[in-house]
């Protein structure tokens, strides 16, 4: 599932392509919105909120969430028609939403109601680290990975950053949140990670952008830990796959 930084720069790409332009075509391929046609409306704002995208045009707001496989593409690209959920065109460009997990057309005045449940947005103007830290610490018995992935705690952490944060703070993904010494440091580090990667596709949490050296543990099962050399372990039995170093990460 895309992380908050991916959605942030997807929004930036859509903003550059569509903002300030008049829609000449709007084809929403969702039965509920099949009759919606925003042709003639001007796209005047594109924004992200956590992992959610909003394209505002006229009195409407197109709300999408990429979920596991979704993407937005700019320009003419070859995609199987059955995968296309929406087509937006202007006089000089085209944006298509592919395999979007959520796609709905909302009233612009109330579109933020769809994301009112989210915690502080790691890449948003409303980022409040102390609120996020309090949210994280609210249930000390909760497994750390589960809490980090809960968008009500803070919006934008996906499975990559979840696993990387667990490693950086030396805790197993299953360790209770209450074992963290300083939840504020954890949410601040989460913010730093996403902020540094918000404008690039070559994500890194190690600070090394060279191929194969960008991440600490995620996707590295069976490879040596970058700190101690122990082989990275993985568990695919849960809802989300987890990765950890059995030496550098502990339960308490």
Swiss-Prot record:
One of its GO terms (molecular function) is zinc ion binding. A zinc finger (FPG-type) spans 216-250. Its cofactor is Zn(2+). Its EC number is 3.2.2.-, 4.2.99.18. Binds 1 zinc ion per subunit. InterPro entries: DNA_glyclase/AP_lyase_DNA-bd, DNA_glyclase_Znf_dom_DNA_BS, Endonuc_Nei2, FPG_cat, MutM-like_N-ter, Nei2_N, Ribosomal_uS13-like_H2TH, Znf_DNA_glyclase/AP_lyase. NCBIfam families: endonuc_Nei2 (NF040775). Monomer. Involved in base excision repair of DNA damaged by oxidation or by mutagenic agents. Acts as DNA glycosylase that recognizes and removes damaged bases. Involved in the repair of psoralen-UVA DNA cross-links. A lyase that cleaves single-stranded (ss)DNA but not double-stranded (ds)DNA with an abasic site. Has 5-hydroxyuracil (5-OH-U) glycosylase activity on ssDNA with 5-OH-U, with 10-fold less activity on dsDNA, but weak to no uracil glycosylase activity. Has weak glycosylase activity on thymine glycol and dihydrothymine residues in ssDNA. Cleaves the DNA backbone by beta-delta elimination to generate a single-strand break at the site of the removed base with both 3'- and 5'-phosphates. This is DNA-(apurinic or apyrimidinic site) lyase Nei2. The gene is nei2.
């Amino acid at each position: 599932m895309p992380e908050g930084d991916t959605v942030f720069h997807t929004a930036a790409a859509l903003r550059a392509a569509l903002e300030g332009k008049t829609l000449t075509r709007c084809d929403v391929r969702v039965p509920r919105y099949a009759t919606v046609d925003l042709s003639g409306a001007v796209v005047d704002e594109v924004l992200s909120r956590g992992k959610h995208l909003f394209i505002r045009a006229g009195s409407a707001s197109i709300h999408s969430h990429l979920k596991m496989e979704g993407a937005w593409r700019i320009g003419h690209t070859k995609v199987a028609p059955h995968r296309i959920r929406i087509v937006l065109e202007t006089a000089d460009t085209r944006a298509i939403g592919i395999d979007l997990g959520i796609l709905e057309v909302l009233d612009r005045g109330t579109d933020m109601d769809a994301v009112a449940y989210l915690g502080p947005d790691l890449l948003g103007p409303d980022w409040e680290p102390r609120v996020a830290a309090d949210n994280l610490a609210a249930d000390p018995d909760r497994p750390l990975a589960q809490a980090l992935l809960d968008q009500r705690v803070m919006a934008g952490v996906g499975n990559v950053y979840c696993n990387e944060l667990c490693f950086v703070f030396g805790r197993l993904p299953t360790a209770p949140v209450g074992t963290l010494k300083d939840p504020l440091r954890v949410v601040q580090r989460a913010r730093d990670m996403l902020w540094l990667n918000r404008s690039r596709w070559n994500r890194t949490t190690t600070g090394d952008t060279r191929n194969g050296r960008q991440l600490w543990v995620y996707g590295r099962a069976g490879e040596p830990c970058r700190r101690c050399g122990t082989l990275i372990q993985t568990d695919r039995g849960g809802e989300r796959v987890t990765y950890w170093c059995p030496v550098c990460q502990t339960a308490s």
